[in-house]
Structures are given as C-alpha cells and as structure tokens.
Regions:
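An acidic, low-aromatic, low-complexity terminal/linker signal
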Residues: 1-177
C-alpha cells in the first residue's frame, strides 16, 4: 500500500515538473524512461499524457511489439511495447499488468496526431541539457527516430528517441505482422 502511495506521489511530482518544464523556454529537456534496463529520453515537447498500465486488448495478426489497444480516458489508443519495438526486450517480460506495477503508458503529444502510447517499464524523472553530455557520434547508420546518445553524471547512457520521427516511421506504423 505504501508503495502505491509513493508511486502516486512520484507521478504527481513528475506531472508538476513536466508542466513547469514545458512552459520554460530553456534548452532541451526530456522525460527519462527505462525499458529492459536501458535508458531512453523522450523530448518533452513531443511527449503527451502518462497513464498507468491499463488492460490491453490484443490485436490479431499484429507484430509482437504491438501489445494491442487500451481504453484511456474513453479513447482507444494503440499500445506499443517500446522495448519490443526497439529489439531490446527481455524475454521474460509480458504485457500483463501483474508484475509490472511501475510500467506506464506514455502518450504522444496531440500535435503529432497519432493515437498511440509507448509502454515503458518505468519512469525515471526528467532530464535537461545541463544534466547530460552528448556522446561522440560513432557514424553508425540508425533510423531517423534515434537521436543523440547522452551520458548522465553517473556515466549511465541515455538514448534520445525523437517521437515526431517515430510517429511517421514506416516500420512503427505497420503493426500488421
């Protein structure tokens, strides 16, 4: 019970910080999320509402990474398992709410015009340009939605994912497998 209360308080603080960060015109800022132990940065300007993990109805004949659809505030949203889509999913993970108390669904900003959420293992707060350092470009060709790789003060890597590019990525939009 205490964990649920602490989680609600964290989510409330994150929502407040998210609102403050969106109104500030300072440099780049991100929502930090984790999937299969890896850190990802989602640009705040492109991220939308954060939802608790809701019941997900599977969609037949779709890719494994497309978890299904969920009713979120009275609207149907596609649910993409981010780790599965990126190919970094741990084999034991499932789409079932049991055992995924920290999992969240992160929506896309309404301006991106896509009724979809990304299922992540947990939220890791907010990050700003001042808190991370960009890694040198290794020259490897990556999809357009994969942005700069950063490191925080502890040396942990964080990969930026451009949601605006992801929302128009052909592989992401093709859920039928």
């Amino acid at each position: 019970m205490a964990n649920k209360q602490a989680l609600r308080e964290l989510q409330s603080r994150l929502a407040e910080r998210l609102q403050v960060a969106r109104t500030q015109a300072r440099g780049q800022s991100w929502l930090a999320v984790e999937c299969s132990g890896r850190g990802f940065l989602l640009p705040l300007r492109e991220a939308g509402e954060i939802f608790a993990l809701a019941p997900i109805l599977p969609v037949p004949h779709s890719h494994r990474w497309f978890a299904g659809v969920a009713n979120l505030r009275g609207h149907l949203h596609g649910v993409v398992d981010l780790a599965g889509f990126l190919g970094v999913k741990a084999t034991s993970a499932s789409h079932e709410p049991a055992g995924r108390e920290q999992s969240r669904l992160v929506g896309f900003n309404q301006t991106l015009d896509i009724n979809c959420t990304l299922m992540v293992d947990r939220l890791s707060g907010l990050r700003s340009e001042e808190e991370v350092t960009a890694d040198a470009d290794d020259g490897v060709q990556r999809p357009a939605f994969v942005g700069v790789r950063y490191r925080d003060a502890a040396g942990r890597p964080w990969q930026e994912l451009k949601l605006s590019e992801l929302a128009s990525d052909e592989a992401f939009l093709k859920i039928v497998g």
